[in-house]
Amino acid sequence: MSRGLGDVYKRQTQNELNEEAAKNLIANGVLAVTEGANMPSTLSAITAFQEAGILFGPAKAANAGGVAVSALEMAQNSSRLAWTFEEVDRKLYDIMATIYEISADAAKSFGQEGNLVFGANIAGFLKVSQAMSEQGIV
């Protein structure tokens, strides 16, 4: 089977990309799927992508870019700075690369190498649990 070279950028509402749509994308040679909304893919769609070896970028990691840019804007405004597009783009790239690395490393550490959904979930859990522990909550 040859893989297609095109990209598909879908921005759905919650649970809109289902297993049938996932299998259609797989059959047509999709290489990677990155969620661009909050939970747009059903669990069965995600499973289909993972079983087919398709790189899958989960919403919680992929959507962090919007949150990161908002934080950069707040930092820029509070410091009365004016960053160029290139500066913001570089900072965002670094943030997103770090999110990928943390997610990939967490997945690998827990025996799920390549499973970015698992890695993002574990990394998020570990960050929250560490904060709770440091605050004496648990």
Please provide the spans of the model-predicted regions.
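Single conserved hydrophobic/aromatic residue that forms the stacking wall/gate
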Residues: 1-9
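Adenosine-phosphate binding glycine-rich loop
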Residues: 10-12, 23-138
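Active-site environment of divalent metal-dependent phosphoester hydrolases
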Residues: 15
